[in-house]
């Protein structure tokens, strides 16, 4: 069995990078280990990743269910704001990732996606020393099969 973590994160990154925008400005996309301290706001973060082997495989192939959390982050210097901007960017992400079968991420030659689901989405507001950080959390689940 192969580890598909890096592949799925790369494919999601490639799908989002250079495509997301708000008010005519591109929205940067970062992996969880690479957000610069002075990152432009808002930005998208590919966050936690989980994988579970499915017992539905065969002698020739393996199945996995993967979960990837994507965060839309926006900091405001006052006590409120950011929800509408995060909602707009979240909608763009959902339209790009949660597609019909013809638009699924291409994981070939080793894997293919059986199903993509929007597992959950919610908004968090965190007070920080200089204002409020609004985070829109979007979790997608992918059921995949090794070819």
Protein language model features and the residues they cover:
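Short, solvent-exposed beta-strand/turn "edge" segments of beta-rich domains on protein surfaces
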Residues: 56-63, 127-131
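Charge-dense, low-complexity intrinsically disordered segments
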Residues: 2-3, 80, 84, 127
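Extracellular/virion structural assembly segments
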Residues: 61-62, 73-100
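Small/polar-rich, solvent-exposed N-terminal microdomains that initiate assembly or binding
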Residues: 1-60, 100-109
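Oligomerization/assembly interface segments of phage tail-like spikes and tubes
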Residues: 62-78, 132-144
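Acidic-leaning, charged glycine-interspersed low-complexity segments
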Residues: 41-44, 94-145
């Amino acid at each position: 069995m192969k580890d598909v973590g890096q592949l799925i994160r790369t494919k999601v990154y490639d799908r989002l990078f250079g495509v997301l925008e708000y008010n005519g400005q591109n929205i940067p996309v970062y992996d969880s280990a690479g957000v610069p301290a002075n990152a432009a706001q808002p930005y998208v973060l590919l966050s936690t990743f989980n994988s579970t082997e499915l017992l539905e495989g065969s002698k020739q192939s393996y199945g996995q269910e993967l979960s990837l959390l994507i965060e839309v982050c926006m900091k405001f210097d006052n006590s409120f704001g950011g929800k509408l901007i995060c909602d707009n960017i979240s909608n763009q992400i959902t339209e790009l990732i949660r597609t019909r079968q013809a638009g699924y991420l291409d994981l070939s030659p080793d894997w293919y996606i059986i199903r993509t689901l929007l597992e959950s989405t919610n908004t968090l507001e965190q007070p920080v020393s200089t204002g409020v950080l609004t985070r829109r959390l979007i979790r997608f689940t992918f059921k995949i099969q090794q070819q």
